[in-house]
């Protein structure tokens, strides 16, 4: 195999070019003025929709009326051939989408006006834009993102670009920290090398740049104009979301619901009480203790010290009172083993004395809807890396996501088709349109699944890195063989299992499952509805079928559905974004792609 060599070169703008750019400028200056055009020319009145044809250069503040003109300008003025790069690197739509956002972010941070890439071999190379965060528009009004592939006929993935952009814009703001802008430099000949894992390193800051204020962040807001604001505002917004999040757990109703969830509570109880070798005499940390039920189990199991961490002030007081009532609380007046710390785990040092890497067992019920909603896993991983001993136990220690296709019975359509003898299906159709953008959390009956379940993603909580919380995975759905007939797949359902495996729970490993095949839990399942149902049938039904109709129709059912699913933490703190791509495969190997859908939970 040819040796891989990548040259990733930054070219600074010349002194002549520098004169053309104001040192006082910022990302907001890169937007067109109120008239939307350059050179002070007056704009003719129109229907107010010119923003869709206003394309901003990737490297400077020039505006163009078409992508072709923009990319030609980038090639001639900045040495960047976008179409050539796509062809050379074989970038699909999503990789190209990420590349544009990556360049925007680097230019905003580094003010580099030219960029060159050369390579002998790109096989197995991971480029710096190959991260899920670059699926979020860096600039919310970026028309280029849904227009750059308009003229390409061989694009493998088909989609409604306008609809995709509308959905992507719902992902919200994106903040860029420019505190270090201009602090580091590199020469024009500096090259990015490939390390042992074949990762291409990120762009370094260019030299000769004006230092920006350390308190400034560039924030793309919901308004038409980007704003430059104090960086502390972002932290305040995060704190506000955290306060609302932890405050929501101050209601006793949600705790009753969780405690009444026997599948959930008994799985944790069995893991803590039926593994004496693990718990007896150990130091235990419970992240997000709520009422303290898991900490009480740990104390009962013989732990020598239990640190219960709770960020909700009210619930920290409740957990303290419960621990005292059950005679396990530990302070100057009580001789128990359980301590309650009112704190976020990231700030635990301020609330309690505990040495780093001194915890034997880290336990937490961190899972949210679709496993990752609420983004609490990041806090658990922080606690693992900060407090857990090397080789210490984390409970649960595995998490696995599954996916399957569901039929019409899992939707509300049948209800609205016959309401006391009246046809109200128009309501059902309107609800259906909403569910193609918003996930539904509900219990799916096993009988309503029309495909076999399949594995989507696995997490090893003992070893995973925090950035692996965001992921992209593929799966193939096969129609169920139990009913040898054609059925409509209206969407996919996601669920998860968490495992207390024999790695740590040697005496009594157990599994907490939220599957449609097991008793329901308060997590239910997460439902993602297709924009249009896909007809599927098992191979036995399709044998000899040589129809020419579109794949996935009732006349030509798909033999399987290939999925590409991405889950990433959203801009809105503690929310997640889910992108879903579906491809129907015929028994003859033909394919049909459906538009990508983006959901926010």
From Swiss-Prot:
MF-aspect GO terms: protein-arginine omega-N asymmetric methyltransferase activity; protein-arginine omega-N monomethyltransferase activity; transcription cis-regulatory region binding; zinc ion binding
Reaction(s) catalysed by this chain, per the record, are: L-arginyl-[protein] + S-adenosyl-L-methionine = N(omega)-methyl-L-arginyl-[protein] + S-adenosyl-L-homocysteine + H(+); L-arginyl-[protein] + 2 S-adenosyl-L-methionine = N(omega),N(omega)-dimethyl-L-arginyl-[protein] + 2 S-adenosyl-L-homocysteine + 2 H(+)
Outline the residue ranges of the record's C2H2-type zinc fingers: 57-78
Query: Which residues act catalytically here?
Result: 365, 374
Q: Where is this region: Disordered?
A: 1-50
Tell me which residues make up the SAM-dependent MTase PRMT-type domain.
Answer: 242-554
Q: Which GO terms describe its biological process?
A: methylation
Where composition is biased (Acidic residues), the residues are 14-27, 35-50
Q: Which Gene3D superfamilies match?
A: Hnrnp arginine n-methyltransferase1 (2.70.160.11), Vaccinia Virus protein VP39 (3.40.50.150)
UniProt keyword Coiled coil, yes or no: no
Write out the biased-composition intervals (Basic and acidic residues). Answer: 1-10
Where does the record place it? Answer: Cytoplasm, Cytosol
Provide this UniProt record's keywords sorted from A to Z.
Cytoplasm, Metal-binding, Methyltransferase, S-adenosyl-L-methionine, Transferase, Zinc, Zinc-finger
**Pfam families cross-referenced by the UniProt entry:** ANM3_C2H2_Zf, Methyltransf_25, PRMT_C
Signal peptide (from-to): none
EC number(s) in its UniProt entry? 2.1.1.319
What's the stated role of this polypeptide? Protein-arginine N-methyltransferase that catalyzes both the monomethylation and asymmetric dimethylation of the guanidino nitrogens of arginine residues in target proteins, and therefore falls into the group of type I methyltransferases.
State the domain notes. The C2H2-type zinc-finger is responsible for substrate specificity.
* Family membership noted in the UniProt record: Belongs to the class I-like SAM-binding methyltransferase superfamily. Protein arginine N-methyltransferase family.
Protein name listed in UniProt: Probable protein arginine N-methyltransferase 3
Q: Which organism is it from?
A: Arabidopsis thaliana (Mouse-ear cress)
């Amino acid at each position: 195999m040819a040796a891989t060599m990548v040259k990733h070169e930054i070219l600074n703008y010349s002194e002549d070019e520098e004169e053309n750019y104001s040192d006082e400028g910022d990302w907001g200056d890169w937007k067109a003025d109120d008239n939307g055009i350059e050179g002070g020319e007056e704009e003719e009145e129109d229907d107010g929709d010119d923003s869709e044809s206003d394309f901003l250069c990737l490297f400077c503040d020039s505006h163009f009326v078409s992508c072709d003109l923009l990319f030609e300008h980038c090639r001639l003025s900045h040495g960047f051939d976008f179409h050539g790069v796509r062809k050379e690197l074989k970038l699909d739509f999503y990789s190209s989408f990420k590349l544009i956002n990556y360049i925007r972010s680097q230019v905003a941070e580094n003010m580099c006006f030219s960029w060159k890439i050369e390579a002998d071999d790109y096989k197995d190379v991971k480029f710096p834009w190959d991260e899920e965060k670059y699926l979020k528009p860096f600039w919310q009004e970026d028309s280029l993102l849904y227009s750059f592939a308009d003229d390409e006929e061989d694009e493998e993935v088909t989609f409604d670009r306008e609809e995709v952009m509308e959905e992507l814009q719902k992902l919200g703001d994106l903040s860029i920290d420019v505190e270090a802008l201009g602090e580091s430099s590199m020469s024009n000949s500096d090259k990015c090398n490939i390390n042992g894992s074949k990762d291409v390193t990120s762009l370094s800051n260019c030299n000769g740049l004006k230092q920006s204020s350390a308190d400034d962040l560039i924030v793309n807001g919901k308004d038409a104009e980007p704003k430059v604001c104090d960086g502390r505002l972002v932290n305040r917004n995060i704190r506000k979301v955290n306060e609302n999040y932890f405050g929501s757990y101050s209601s006793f109703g949600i705790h009753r619901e969780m405690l009444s969830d026997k599948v959930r509570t008994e799985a944790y109880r069995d893991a803590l009480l039926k593994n004496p070798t693990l718990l007896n005499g150990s130091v235990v940390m419970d992240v997000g203790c709520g009422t303290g039920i898991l900490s009480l189990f740990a104390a009962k199991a013989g732990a020598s010290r239990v640190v219960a961490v709770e960020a909700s002030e009210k619930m920290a007081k409740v957990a303290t009172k419960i621990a005292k009532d059950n005679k396990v609380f530990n302070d100057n007046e009580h001789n128990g083993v359980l301590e309650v710390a009112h704190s976020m785990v990231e700030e635990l040092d301020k609330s309690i004395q505990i040495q780093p890497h001194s915890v034997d067992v880290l336990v937490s019920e961190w899972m949210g809807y679709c496993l990752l909603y609420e983004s609490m896993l990041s806090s658990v991983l922080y606690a693992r890396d900060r407090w857990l001993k090397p080789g210490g136990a984390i409970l649960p220690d595995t998490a696995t996501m599954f996916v399957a296709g569901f039929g019409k019975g899992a939707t509300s359509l049948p209800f609205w088709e016959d309401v006391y003898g009246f046809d109200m299906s128009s309501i059902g159709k309107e609800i259906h349109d909403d569910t193609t953008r918003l996930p539904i959390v509900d219990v799916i009956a096993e009988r309503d699944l029309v495909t076999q379940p399949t594995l989507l993603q696995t997490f090893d909580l003992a070893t995973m890195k925090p950035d692996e919380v965001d992921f992209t995975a593929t799966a193939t759905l096969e129609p169920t063989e139990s009913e040898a007939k054609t059925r409509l797949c209206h969407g996919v359902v996601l669920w998860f299992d968490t495992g207390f495996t024999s790695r740590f729970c040697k005496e009594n490993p157990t599994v907490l499952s939220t599957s449609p095949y097991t008793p329901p839990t308060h997590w239910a399942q997460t439902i993602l509805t297709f924009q249009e149902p896909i007809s599927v049938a098992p191979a036995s039904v399709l044998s000899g079928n040589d129809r020419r109709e579109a794949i996935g129709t009732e006349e030509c059912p798909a033999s399987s559905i290939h999925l590409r699913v991405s889950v990433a933490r959203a801009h809105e703190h503690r929310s997640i974004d889910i992108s879903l791509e579906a491809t129907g495969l015929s028994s003859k190997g033909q394919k049909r792609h459906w538009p990508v859908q983006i959901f926010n939970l």
